[in-house]
Amino acid sequence: MKGGCVSQWKAAAGLLFCVTVFASAERPVFTNHFLVELHKGGEEEARQVAAEHGFGVRKLPFAEGLYHFYHNGLAKAKRRRSLHHKQRLERDPRVKRALQQEGFDRKKRGYRDINEIDINMNDPLFTKQWYLINTGQADGTPGLDLNVAEAWELGYTGKGVTIGIMDDGIDYLHPDLASNYNAEASYDFSSNDPYPYPRYTDDWFNSHGTRCAGEVSAAANNNICGVGVAYSSKVAGIRMLDQPFMTDIIEASSISHMPQLIDIYSASWGPTDNGKTVDGPRELTLQAMADGVNKGRGGKGSIYVWASGDGGSYDDCNCDGYASSMWTISINSAINDGRTALYDESCSSTLASTFSNGRKRNPEAGVATTDLYGNCTLRHSGTSAAAPEAAGVFALALEANLGLTWRDMQHLTVLTSKRNQLHDEVHQWRRNGVGLEFNHLFGYGVLDAGAMVKMAKDWKTVPERFHCVGGSVQDPEKIPSTGKLVLTLTTDACEGKENFVRYLEHVQAVITVNATRRGDLNINMTSPMGTKSILLSRRPRDDDSKVGFDKWPFMTTHTWGEDARGTWTLELGFVGSAPQKGAVKEWTLMLHGSQSAPYIDQVVRDYQSKLAMSKKEELEEELDEAVERSLKSILGKH
């Protein structure tokens, strides 16, 4: 699988984004979904065209004049049988273009323990929900939890907030979910109807979405199963995973579904976590995400929460274009004693963590939640379980302040997540150039619901966001078999221009590189303030020797708040004893952040907090720069 940016950067909804295309050595699979654009006419014309050719139709909300045609009578993997339908559409004089959607794989991120134990619980599971309130149950570490109790005591339970679960459907008849189900905001994109109920299978494989929904919105005090993180929130089902192949049009439609009703979208799926896949959103989905953060929630931006991945130490979530997107909040997981789960992937794009299981045989160490057909379970797990917990915490924050933008939520995540008692046996905790503590696996720490709602209540919207191409290295350079290739790039971060970026949020290194064995590549980038981000770690199962990375946007959040001006360093090398060859053809530095200090006007309640530290840092920097400007002015006059 090959991924990269074409036409390098595309503008949509006032934002720059990388248009990613993918090529595979395998024969493409063609589906019964078509992207159709008409020469003229509106939705009524599209319905007429669709009906004449035997298609159903939906208008795409994120793009003017584009329609989703679907033909339920077509075999999903037969190019020959569907070709004449495509040709008939193309020959219709009203149709400008008709693109048949290719199918690709998307996997649920649920970890299935080989020692699964059947447990039928009739009693409420609240005392077993250690990730909500950890008192040491299931051999856990007391106090290592989401601190939801503090948020609940302050009166925040998710009222007025809707979370969309993009998955295999939800059991909206479940007695622990029914009272919080938002039917108006729900849809089934697998069957094209408004009833996203899971398809029955003997092995309950399609329980994934129902379990995620219960973590967020299971009702409280009804003697059924457990309690959702935001137990007064509404949950919407967006069924989109349960078909033989995923398509760009289904993903884009799901991500852009009802953006004025749905506040938070939770995704516990992504490309295959096999340690050798490089994949991400296609063009329509990228466009839908850009549209979501720019226009969703009345212009405040849809909040996308993504599970970082279940590939373990064999994989790297920077090879997943969903988890490593600037527009998503990528969430990893810890187990109940603070260690990493066996399936956790590490990467520089992860923003924070919540909880799941993964190492322990204790049957109560899993995540307790709702299950299919009115049942309960103690066995939900994987980063699949982590993302909905985060969505629930964000729902509590939104209730505290409905004016929060998608960027505000990311800033709050950075500032209120805590190291707590998290322990990473491989990667140390470090501080970036402005003193923010981060970890390559856990991001900025575990979410703290109490701290987040308290800060959210007084939060002032962060300054406008700008995008700067900080520079580019285009000369091909060979990567030595031993040692490292070191490249440097000095940037002024567009200073003096209208898109100057002074305070960093996200940084992307767009890299084109080939190697005799892609999985042995290691790429690090160091900022001018000395923060080292591991952009790519070794993936021992990735034996690609042909496609490499083609304009792939590696992303880091570790330089959050730093000054981008100065010299950036990129190091590329091989891990392992086998001789290797490689060459880097391009490195483009993309800087995203604000010109004005984001925290100077924020209200500080806790003078030991990261906000207090960051605000002090900003004030000192602003003072230093003001003094420097004054000195230059005085010297200029003399």
Swiss-Prot record:
Tell me which domain of life the UniProt entry assigns to the organism this sequence originates from.
Answer: Eukaryota
Q: What is its EC number?
A: 3.4.21.94
- Gene3D superfamilies under this entry? Galactose-binding domain-like, Peptidase S8, pro-domain, Peptidase S8/S53 domain
- The UniProt record lists the P/Homo B domain at 461-597
Q: Which residues are glycosylated?
A: 375, 514, 524
Q: Which CDD domains match?
A: Peptidases_S8_Protein_convertases_Kexins_Furin-like (cd04059)
Query: One GO term of the cellular component aspect?
Result: neuron projection
Q: Where is the signal peptide?
A: 1-25
Which part of the chain is the Peptidase S8 domain? 129-453
Q: Which GO terms describe its biological process?
A: peptide hormone processing
Tell me which InterPro entries the record gives: Galactose-bd-like_sf, Kexin/furin, P_dom, Peptidase_S8/S53_dom, Peptidase_S8/S53_dom_sf, Peptidase_S8_Asp-AS, Peptidase_S8_His-AS, Peptidase_S8_Ser-AS
Q: Which residues form the propeptide?
A: 26-109
Under the heading PANTHER family, the entry gives: NEUROENDOCRINE CONVERTASE 2, PROPROTEIN CONVERTASE SUBTILISIN/KEXIN-RELATED
Its principal location?
cytoplasm
Q: Where is the active site?
A: 167 (charge relay system), 208 (charge relay system), 384 (charge relay system)
State if Protease is listed as a keyword. yes
| One GO molecular-function entry | serine-type endopeptidase activity
- Which named protein is this? Neuroendocrine convertase 2
